[in-house]
Amino acid sequence: CIVDAVAGGGYFHYAGDFNDQQINFYQYANAFVKNGGSFSWATDLGSGFVNSYSFYLLGSPFFWLSMVVPARLMPWAMVPLLCLKMAVAGGGGYLWARRWVRDETWSMLAGCLYAFSGFSIYNIFFNHFLDVVALFPYMLAALDDAVIDDKKGAFPFWVALNLVDNYFFFAGQAVFLIIYFFCMAAGRRYEL
């Protein structure tokens, strides 16, 4: 992200939905929220702001963090946000893997492989996909903590954050968590 931005004179060069939608959504939503709007005449033929933008960014902690940046600077803030999402994803992958490996080097490798997986790199132009990738391993690690260590406090938080972040992707995450739970129980990693 940073190398491309420096080489491109401060711009992250990417074509398609990233330029046509994602940057514009962030910039528009940033200004809209700061101006206290509720109904957007600029979206489609006019639409409720929450209806239109909840799938893309309204539940994203990364979007709310971007509110410290003026709307006019959002195109340049996208590179640091992408880097932050990758770092958070890598940290989550590391956190989850740390429990399951003997050598911490492997958990660091797992974090890097997770953050820079083919899915993440390919779907970089769908900026909101990376929010889901960044937050999911924390929910998975919190499930392990809840079942194995009886530390249940973090799990509802991460479930709620992932749900609010993107309700559509959460359906898949919930199915995966259920399968993961039963596989861990069947493999006797979870003592029930």
Model-derived segments and spans:
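Membrane-embedded helix bundles of polyisoprenyl
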Residues: C83, A87-R99, T105-G187
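Membrane-interface coil-to-helix junctions
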Residues: C1-G90, C112-A134
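Membrane-interfacial entry segments at the cytosolic side of transmembrane helices
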Residues: R189-L192
